[in-house]
């Protein structure tokens, strides 16, 4: 999967899940999204809180080829689950790498699934797929399960800081300023195309948490 599943290094190792790193820039310096090894999480979030300029970049096709090829050389087939196509074009890079490698390894199988999810929801899907693998399900069975059940994961989340919604162009500067004054916490989720959709504008953190709990009960 991709590092954007937001599982810990220890969890990836314990579940025997391989991952490829995205990239990000912090104040013009590029880092690998390598789960806090290049820059500790506390330093990263402190820099963001201080107003650092941030930018992300997806994995390119060449990087995917370098990531996939050792498995193929070892005689293994591959099932790779990507970050949602609704927020990233990374699946396109993975598909290009798949096509290139299948020409060189015609006896091997490379299956790619668009998770239509992100962060801990994406990680939850990966955990379930690892369970199926450990139960002895075949690669094709795990692939079909992922395709069929990926939308059973519901993503609901909020932020009390509108700064990065403004920087990302999701809300205007005016709306961000007004929202900050009024203590508005946007509640978002991911739709069936894996896109981030603002659903509610709720005043105060306590009320938005209550709404998320209600959504958990609704979709459980």
What are these regions (language model features)?
Residues 1-63:
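N-terminal glycine-rich anion-binding loop in soluble enzyme alpha/beta folds
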Residues 4-12, 17-23, 79, 86-99, ...:
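Mixed-charge interfacial surface used for oligomerization/domain docking
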Residues 31, 44-45, 64, 68, ...:
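Aromatic side chains
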Residues 49-85, 92, 96, 143:
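Glycine-rich phosphate- or other oxyanion-binding loops that anchor nucleotides, phosphorylated ligands
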